[in-house]
Amino acid sequence: MHSATRVLDDRPRIVVADEDHSVVQFVMQTLRKDGNAVFHAYDSLSAVQLAFSLDRCDLLISNTRVEGLPGIDLIHQLRRKLPDLPILYMANIGRSTPELEAQLPSDVPILREPFTAEELRAAVRPFIPDGRG
């Protein structure tokens, strides 16, 4: 087996779905610095394809703004096929938390935007097998 493949196999795999390129870059840079393998999708179809194409997806981080499907619909679609997929939902601070929570599965936490690198790490940490995040 190629050494790069072994390294990737050992690293937590995270898919980030958001149409805002600056948010995606911030999340990817932050989580890659912590040793995670981070993949991005700017639309819902790509996010679904990524989650299914990886032999293991440790976490999906999605936003309300994902081209194609709204982020909540993306989460429900993925959960039908991957019921155990851990998901973290990024939401703009303007959204009503109770209204949003009612639409999400109960085990999907909300990371309120804007957030810092440390807030992102704290939100990701419970989902990553070896505590990276």
Where are these regions (language model features)?
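Two-component signal transduction core modules
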Residues: 60, 110-111
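Acidic, metal-coordinating helix/loop segments flanking the phosphotransfer/catalytic sites
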Residues: 40-59, 63
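Acidic catalytic/metal-coordinating carboxylates
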Residues: 43, 70-73
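Structural signature of beta-strand start/N-cap positions in the alpha/beta core
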Residues: 13, 37, 56-58, 86
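Non-catalytic signal-transmission and effector/linker regions of two-component phosphorelay proteins
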Residues: 1-15, 19-21, 25-28, 76, ...
